[in-house]
A protein has these predicted regions:
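Bacterial N-terminal signal peptides
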Residues: 11-19
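Boundary at the C-terminal end of the N-terminal hydrophobic targeting segment
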Residues: 22-24
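Asp/Glu-centered strand-loop micro-motifs enriched in Gly/Pro and often flanked by an aromatic residue
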Residues: 40-70, 78
Length: 398
C-alpha cells in the first residue's frame, strides 16, 4: 500500500476507544480486540444443528435467517471467527451440495434442502452467481486454517475448477443475460439488484477464486500447466475488469455493463483490497472516498453506491431501502484499507464511529439513520475485522 504521513488529529468528532482525544495505535488494537470478542460471542449464538447433527452457522445470532448461507460463512471464516473443529464438517456439507454439472447454491436449510437461488428459491430463475466462487473460498480457508490434506484431493480440486468454468461468461467476464428478466442474482449482497450484462463484483470474486485455486493446486503438486492456467485466467480477468468497468470521468468502477450500471462503492474498495485496481486508480478511488465521505458513510458503515445514485431495478424498487441505499458494516474493512492511501485520520474516524455504533446498537446487518436491521450480523464483524487486522499490520510495517 502507498504509505502516507499519519495525521495525529482525527477528522471531525471521533468517539475515542481508548479515552484519548486522538485515535492511535492502541485504539486500533482495542477496536480489533473488541471485534474479536464480539465476533466470538455472536458466532457461538449463530451455531445451528443440521438434522444430521452437523454444526453449521446462520448469518446472524437471531432467527431471521433460517439456513446456513454459503457466502456469509465464507466471509466469516476468512475473518477468523469459525472454530477449527467445525470447519471440515461445513466444508464437506457445502461441497456435497454442488451439482454434478458444477452449479453452486445460495444456502442450505437445516433439514438439508439446498437452495440454489436467493429468498429460499423465490428470487430469480437460475443459481445465484456467487455460489460458483464461494465454495472455492470455503475449501481454501478450511485447508489454510486446518492444514487438512483432504482438501487437496483431485476430486475436490476438479470440482472447484468445474464450478468456475460453469459460471456464465460473455466477453471473458461473468454475465447475466439481459434478455431474461432477472435470470439470476449476482452476488449475495446485491441479490435483490436486477443487474445484467457483465458484472464487476462477480469478476472480482472470480479473480480471488482463481488465485485461491492456483494455490491449492500448487500445494497438491498438480501439473504446472494446470496451475498456470488458473493464474493466467486471473490475470486476464484483471485486464478485462480494468478495460470494461472503469469510469475515468468519475473515478470509480461501474457495477455492470447493461442494467444497473451505477458506480460500485463496495466493489471499487474490494478491487483495491485485491490489488486489481492499478495504483493510480486505487489513489483516485481513495480520493473519491475522502471527498465524498459524508454521502457514502454513516456511523462507520458504507453505502453500496455514491449518494444520490440508486439501482435501475431491484426486487422492491424502493429507494433508501436494503441494498438500495442502506449503510452496511460488511465492506468497512475494504473501505478503510482503500481510504488509508490518502486519509489515515479519516480511517481512524471511520473505525471509531463503527465501534461506537456497534457498542451502542449492536453490529447490525445494515443501518439508515435511526433504523437498524438484523442485529448481531456476522459479516458486519468478521469482514471489518479481517480488514482492520491487515491495516494494523501495514501500519506497523509488518
Amino acid at each position: 500500500m502507498k504509505r502516507t504521513m499519519r495525521k495525529m488529529a482525527v477528522c471531525g468528532a471521533v468517539l475515542s476507544l481508548g479515552g484519548l482525544s486522538a485515535f492511535g495505535a492502541a485504539d486500533l488494537d482495542a477496536a480489533i480486540g473488541w471485534l474479536e470478542a464480539k465476533g466470538g460471542e455472536i458466532v457461538r449464538k449463530a451455531e445451528r444443528k443440521m438434522d444430521d447433527g452437523r454444526t453449521v452457522y446462520a448469518p446472524q445470532a437471531g432467527d431471521w435467517y433460517k439456513a446456513a448461507w454459503l457466502r456469509d460463512y465464507a466471509m466469516t471464516q476468512a475473518g477468523g471467527l469459525i472454530p477449527k473443529e467445525h470447519q471440515n464438517g461445513v466444508a464437506e456439507l457445502y461441497l456435497s451440495a454442488v451439482t454434478p454439472e458444477g452449479d453452486g447454491f445460495d444456502c442450505i436449510k437445516f433439514d438439508g434442502s439446498v437452495m440454489q437461488r436467493p429468498g429460499y428459491n423465490r428470487i430469480s430463475g437460475k443459481p445465484v452467481m456467487d455460489g460458483y466462487t464461494y465454495v472455492t473460498a470455503v475449501i481454501y480457508e478450511t485447508w489454510k486454517q486446518t492444514g487438512d490434506a483432504q482438501w487437496l484431493k483431485p476430486e475436490v480440486l476438479d470440482t472447484l475448477a468445474k464450478m468456475l468454468d460453469r459460471m456464465p461468461h460473455r466477453n471473458g467476464l461473468p454475465w447475466i443475460n439481459p434478455e431474461e428478466p432477472h435470470e439470476r442474482a449476482p452476488w449475495g449482497f446485491n441479490d435483490s439488484v436486477q443487474m445484467t450484462g457483465n458484472l464487476f463484483f462477480m469478476s472480482l470474486l472470480e479473480i480471488r477464486a482463481r488465485r485461491e485455486l492456483a494455490t491449492l493446486l500448487t500445494a497438491a503438486g498438480r501439473p504446472d500447466a494446470e496451475i498456470a492456467a488458473q493464474r493466467q485466467r486471473a490475470t486476464e480477468l484483471v485486464l478485462l475488469v480494468n478495460r470494461t468497468f472503469w469510469d475515468d470521468a468519475f473515478g470509480l468502477y461501474r457495477a455492470a455493463t447493461v442494467r444497473c450500471r451505477q458506480h460500485d462503492v463496495w466493489g471499487s474498495a474490494y478491487a483495491v483490497w485485491l490489488g486489481v485496481a492499478p495504483d493510480d486508480r486505487a489513489d483516485r478511488i481513495a480520493r473519491y472516498f475522502r471527498d465524498h465521505y459524508e454521502g457514502i458513510v454513516q456511523r462507520g458503515q458504507i453505502r453500496h453506491m455514491p449518494a444520490g445514485e440508486y439501482w435501475d431495478k431491484t426486487c422492491w424498487d424502493k429507494k433508501d431501502h436494503y441494498q438500495n441505499g442502506h449503510f452496511w458494516g460488511t465492506p468497512t474493512g475494504w473501505f478503510c484499507w482503500t481510504l488509508e492511501r490518502v486519509a489515515p485520520s479519516l480511517v481512524d474516524k471511520t473505525v471509531a464511529d463503527l465501534i461506537a455504533d456497534y457498542k451502542a446498537r449492536g453490529p447490525n446487518e445494515r443501518v439508515f439513520g435511526e433504523t437498524t436491521s438484523c442485529p448481531e450480523y456476522l459479516t458486519s464483524v468478521a469482514t471489518p475485522l479481517q480488514g482492520l487486522k491487515r491495516l494494523q499490520a501495514a501500519r506497523k510495517g509488518l
